[in-house]
A protein has these predicted regions:
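Glycine/proline-enriched, intrinsically flexible loops and inter-domain linkers
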Residues: 1-474
Length: 474
C-alpha cells in the first residue's frame, strides 16, 4: 500500500490558504511532500477558523478558571456549576462569513452547530440567543441579509424545539460588507453525566452517526478564515446546508445513548468535518486513528477521500464507544432512523491513517495538526481613542428626540423577535424582550438562570478595551 500521489504547486498551496512559510513547515513535519488530501487537511486544521493562529496569543490571557468553572476552553463548550448536581453548558460562536454569502443557511447552520456543541457534552439545550450586526438598513443588500439571517435562526431553533429567548440587533454602515452573526446556546446537564471528547482505549471502535456526507461545505473552515466582498457569492457551495429535523433526531438519539454507558468520547463534526473531529479526539487522548473511508455514509456518488474528509455536511457526530456496546449503539440509532457506521478504530501510532479501496491514501501525525499550528503575533499599533466632537448649536429637544427614536437601532425589534418561539418547552419565565435578561427555570429545583447577550459597538470602536469592559458589565 502506498500513498496517493498528486502534483502540488504554488497555486494549489495558495488556493488552500497556506503561506509559503507554512508549506515549508509542513515539509519539515512530514519530511516529504504531502499529497492533495494531506494538504487539504493541513489547510483546514491550520486555518484561522480552526487553529486561532492569530488570536490564540490574546485568548490565552483571558481568565478561564474559577470556583464554579467545571470546564473551560478546549472542549466543545464551557460548563459552569450552578449548585447541587446541576451545571450549565454554554457556547457562543460566530457564523459571519457563511451568513454573508448565504444568509438563510449560514445563520441556520450557525444555530445548529452550537446546539450540537452543547448536547455533545451531555446537556439538553434549554435556550438560544443571538447577537446580530448589519449595515445601512436603506441598502437593499442589508435588507436581504437581515431577512435571510433572521428567518434562518428562527426556522432552525423553532423546528428543533429550543426557545430563542434573547438577543440584540443593530445597524451601521461599517457592517455593509462584514455582517456579524453570533449564535449562542445554553444547556442543562447533571454534573455526573458530562461527556468529553478525549478518545482512549486502543482498538476501540469509532462510530459515525447522522446525515450522509455530501459535497456541501468543503473548505468551509478555510473560507471562513478569508476576507470576502460582494463577489463572494461564488463561495456559496462552501456554505453548509442545515436540516433541523435531522438535528432533533440526532439530539434525542444521543441523549438516549448517553444513558447506556456506551460512549467513551464524542465530538460534533463541525468546522472541517470528519477531519477536525477525528484529529481533535485523538490528540486529546494521545492516540492514533485508522479510518476506512469506504465506510463513510455518502449521499453523493463517486466522492473522493479529499471530499469526505473536508466536507462540512451538518448534523453529524463522531464517537468512540465501548466495544461491548456496539450493538446497543446501532440499535438506538436505527430506532431513530439515523445512519450509523463503524468507520475506524483507535491505534497507538499517534498518526491518522486513511484508507480508501484498501489503499493508504493519507498518513499524518496528529499532534502537529491538532495542537501545533503556527501562531502569529500580527503587526499592530495602538489605536487612539476616538471622541465624538459635538458642535455647539441650538437644538430643539423635540427634534433631537424624534431623530433618536427614528434610528433603526432604537426602533422596535418586534418583527424580528416574533419569528423566534421563546416559549417552547414552557420554561421561559421572561424573555429578554420583556426584561434586561431572559430567565429560564431549572426543573425539579427552585433555581433559575438569567441569560443575556449584549454589546455596544460604538463604545468598542471608540475604545476597544473600555468597550469590552462595558460589554461585560452590561
Amino acid at each position: 500500500m502506498s500513498l496517493e500521489k498528486g502534483l502540488i504547486n504554488s497555486k494549489i498551496i495558495k488556493d488552500h490558504g497556506l503561506t509559503k512559510s507554512e508549506y515549508k513547515l509542513i515539509l519539515k513535519i512530514l519530511k516529504r511532500k504531502p499529497n492533495l488530501l494531506e494538504l487539504g487537511i493541513f489547510s483546514v486544521m491550520w486555518s484561522e477558523h480552526c487553529s486561532y493562529k492569530s488570536t490564540k496569543k490574546w485568548l490565552k490571557t483571558l481568565p478561564t478558571s474559577g470556583e464554579y468553572v467545571i470546564c473551560g476552553p478546549g472542549e466543545n463548550a464551557g460548563i459552569i456549576d450552578i449548585g447541587g448536581n446541576d451545571a450549565i453548558v454554554f457556547k457562543m460562536e460566530s457564523h459571519n462569513h457563511p451568513s454573508f454569502i448565504e444568509p438563510y443557511q449560514g445563520a441556520a447552520t450557525g444555530v445548529g452547530g452550537i446546539m450540537r456543541d452543547v448536547f455533545t457534552m451531555g446537556a439538553r439545550p434549554i435556550a438560544n440567543l443571538n447577537s446580530l450586526r448589519f449595515g445601512d438598513i436603506s441598502n437593499n443588500k442589508t435588507k436581504n441579509l437581515l431577512q435571510g439571517v433572521v428567518k434562518g435562526i428562527g426556522d432552525y431553533g423553532n423546528c428543533v424545539g429550543i426557545p430563542t429567548v434573547g438577543g440584540e440587533c443593530s445597524f451601521h454602515k461599517s457592517y455593509n460588507n462584514n455582517i456579524l452573526v453570533n449564535a449562542m446556546c445554553v444547556g442543562l446537564v447533571k454534573k455526573n453525566k458530562i461527556f468529553y471528547s478525549k478518545a482512549k482505549g486502543i482498538g476501540n471502535p469509532i462510530i459515525y452517526v447522522g446525515s450522509k456526507t455530501g459535497r456541501d461545505g468543503i473548505h468551509g473552515a478555510t473560507m471562513a478564515s478569508a476576507e470576502f466582498d460582494d463577489n463572494s457569492i461564488d463561495q456559496r457551495p462552501q456554505v453548509q446546508v442545515g436540516d433541523p429535523f435531522m438535528e432533533k433526531l440526532l439530539l434525542e438519539s444521543c441523549q438516549e445513548l448517553m444513558k447506556e454507558d456506551a460512549i467513551i468520547a464524542i465530538q460534533d463534526m463541525g468546522a472541517a468535518g470528519l477531519t477536525s473531529s477525528s484529529f481533535e479526539m485523538a490528540s486529546k487522548g494521545n492516540c492514533g486513528v485508522k479510518l476506512f473511508l469506504n465506510e463513510v455514509p455518502c449521499r453523493e456518488s463517486k466522492m473522493t477521500p479529499y471530499e469526505m474528509m473536508l466536507s462540512e455536511t451538518q448534523e453529524r457526530m463522531l464517537m468512540v464507544i465501548k466495544p461491548d456496546k456496539k450493538q446497543v449503539t446501532f440499535d438506538i440509532f436505527k430506532k431513530w432512523g439515523l445512519d450509523a457506521k463503524e468507520v475506524g478504530y483507535l491505534t497507538d501510532t499517534g498518526k491518522m491513517q486513511m484508507y480508501f479501496n484498501n489503499n493508504l491514501v493519507g498518513e499524518l501525525p496528529i499532534k502537529p495538526l491538532a495542537d501545533s499550528a503556527p501562531e502569529y503575533d500580527r503587526p499592530r499599533k495602538k489605536k487612539e481613542s476616538k471622541t465624538i466632537k459635538v458642535r455647539k448649536r441650538k437644538l430643539k429637544i423635540k427634534n433631537v428626540f424624534l431623530k433618536m427614536i427614528s434610528s433603526p437601532n432604537h426602533s422596535s425589534k418586534e418583527w424580528l423577535f416574533r419569528q423566534y418561539d421563546n416559549m417552547v418547552m414552557c420554561d421561559t419565565i421572561f424573555s429578554s424582550e420583556e426584561s434586561d435578561a431572559a430567565i429560564i427555570r431549572i426543573h425539579n429545583s427552585k433555581k433559575a438562570v438569567a441569560i443575556s447577550c449584549d454589546c455596544n459597538p460604538v463604545y468598542c470602536n471608540s475604545d476597544p478595551k473600555l468597550g469590552a469592559k462595558l460589554a461585560v458589565a452590561e
